[in-house]
Swiss-Prot record:
One of its GO terms (biological process) is cytoplasmic translation. InterPro entries: Ribosomal_protein_uL10, Ribosomal_uL10, Ribosomal_uL10-like_insert, Ribosomal_uL10-like_insert_sf, Ribosomal_uL10-like_sf, Ribosomal_uL10_arc. CDD domains: Ribosomal_P0_L10e. Pfam families: Ribosomal_L10, RL10P_insert. It comes from the Archaea. Residues 313-331 have a biased composition (Acidic residues). This is Large ribosomal subunit protein uL10. Forms part of the ribosomal stalk, playing a central role in the interaction of the ribosome with GTP-bound translation factors. Residues 304-340 are annotated as: Disordered. The gene is rpl10. It comes from Thermococcus kodakarensis (strain ATCC BAA-918 / JCM 12380 / KOD1) (Pyrococcus kodakaraensis (strain KOD1)). Keywords: Ribonucleoprotein, Ribosomal protein, RNA-binding, rRNA-binding. The keyword Cell membrane does not apply. Part of the 50S ribosomal subunit. Forms part of the ribosomal stalk which helps the ribosome interact with GTP-bound translation factors. Forms a heptameric L10(L12)2(L12)2(L12)2 complex, where L10 forms an elongated spine to which the L12 dimers bind in a sequential fashion.
Amino acid sequence: MAHVAEWKKKEVEELANIIKSYPVIALVDVAGVPAYPLSKMRDKLRGKALLRVSRNTLIELAIKRAAQELGQPELEKLIDHIQGGAAILATEMNPFKLYKLLEESKTPAPAKAGAVVPKDVVIPAGPTSLAPGPLVGEMQALGIPARIEKGKVSIQKDYTVLKAGEVITEQLARILNALGIEPLEVGLNLLAAYEDGIVYTPDVLAIDESEYINMLQKAYMHAFNLSVNIAYPTKQTIEAILQKAYLGAKNVAVEAGYITKDTVEDIFGRAIRAVLLIAQNLPEDLLDEKTKELLNAQAQMAVAAAPQPTEEKVEEAEEEEEEEEASEEDALAGLGALFG
């Protein structure tokens, strides 16, 4: 039986204890992260999460041990996501907040041949600080719309040179570095996170917050409207349901002419409007003074509510009238000439 170093046993035990002590356990890839950015990340996570870098094999053993001791076999599914330079990130933060924190903590990094870009790389349109040289030919060979303008290299339009997930070539790395474009990111890449028996992967955690909030708002409004329409009372909808019921009952009472303190004004208002409608078609000598006053007031309200022509429209109308008058005069002159 092979001898296992004591420090490895101790490391596995410590890792397992960390895993058992936190509700959320994540795996992050620290491979390729320089010492200084990693140190800054530790500082940022202090008080929020515990980062423990170790060997992949020891992390795997620790996960198995913790899963067995906790009685949570689902935890072992994390092992499938161990890759690169894995490290354990233990926290009480929910996986979605943790993923957002890690993504926001990443900083841009220069292009490096052989590296995979995390997102589309676009060379923006506009002038650059590059002087004419062989690089222009290399750009054009790759389809980049570059040309010389005023002694400098200028990009004619936005051009996508790499799609997310593609690899940077040596030639493209040289061009991007010359242009000062940093397509890479330095930070901790979350590989997977475990909470309450569920393993979350980055594609699940990478949500569009604004879109998600919009979806929740729409769902809330649909549920609210449905609750009101079927008269299902809740704390949120009871007021709207009562208002709807009140207005419905009031409208029925008004239509039926049933007088109450809430309907009397509407009923008499309808009656007066009906009387005035009839009065408009009667001879004026049959109307009393009060009815005439009401008809005049109604007419004034209608005039006040009608849209007034603007000064420009009035001027245009006057110009049109002048043109019409001129054309009429021309026509009369023409007739006069015709008949001598």
